[in-house]
Amino acid sequence: MPHNIAMTVLVFEDNLIWSSRLVKSLKALGHTPIVRIKPDSSSSDAQVAIVNLGSEGLDPEKLVPALNAAGIHTIGHAGHKETELLEFGRSAGCKTLATNSQLTFKLESLLAAVQSSDL
């Protein structure tokens, strides 16, 4: 099984529990997480951004297109019952959508899919 290449991952999350969980998981997978609690898409070396679609403070409607314009692969996430938020993420331009449980239990495969799509 090929080893995934380490990436810099922006984590747009204003929920402390989620952000700490994602940081721990990303570090365990060998990636470098950068947590942002405000909508700021600037990071010249980030390859991926994980965006909480349910956070009004992050303004995902503007943030996702800005990340796309910067060439950053955007993974939007919301609860599995929050179908409107997931649809919003699709229309906002998220390249990957995930439920919260997928983000928790399948983060490694989600990031591997990003890497293989960028080859």
Task: Tell me what each language-model feature is.
Residues 81-95:
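Alpha4 helix (beta4-alpha4-beta5 surface) of REC/receiver domains from two-component response regulators
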Residues 108-119:
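A charged, well-structured terminal subsegment
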Residues 36-48:
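Acidic, metal-coordinating helix/loop segments flanking the phosphotransfer/catalytic sites
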